[in-house]
Amino acid sequence: MSYISTAGLLKQQDFPDSFKFYFKLHQNKNSIEEISVLKDLVRPRLKITIVTETWSPEINGVANSLLQLCKGLQKLGHRIQLIRPIQKNICTDFQAEQECLVWAKSIPKYADMQFGMPQYVKVSKAIERFTPDVVHIVTEGPLGLTALYAAQAHQIPVSSGFHSTFHDFSRFFDLALLVKPIESYLRWFHNHTVLTCVPSQTTLNQLQAFGVTCPLVEVGRGVDTTRFHP
């Protein structure tokens, strides 16, 4: 690891003189621990609004991945607002700084799947109150679309996540006739965000071929090394 000067990092942010004196006094060019501490001190802390129509303890890959993402962001000092539908069961593994709950509607014939109702005024007021640095939309359903419009109205950058090939498996949910409109909508949705996160290089390539032209960034799925290790 290359050495990062203490002076350079301290200039990035206003610290009390006592902090600066301590770090200068204990400066050690071979101290990886010191570099780590300094990086943590100067890392920007963001206010992030996360919008999703699925959330733990629902059992699916998107809900589980999102839970781990929120835990990781909060551990790094970021402040999280969660906008999601009301659920029958409560998640006990994570507590957001703020939550905005909207009414939920089950998908016909699939009671375990639901989407959030487009309560624009409620969502807009929640975003305005939290004043996030960015709004990250995980799902592209009615709630996600509502959040997109609300964030744009407040001139807040919007990022999105592409987690499920809904336009593919919709063929198996009696929605075959809607595949083309769904494809067009998903392409339009993600092209109206400043960034779309994807789980793999394969998905990134597929979205580019699909016509998504906004910047795409691979955010791989991690492994809990406490539970899973050699």
Which residue ranges define each predicted feature?
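Structural motif
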Residues: 83, 137-138, 161
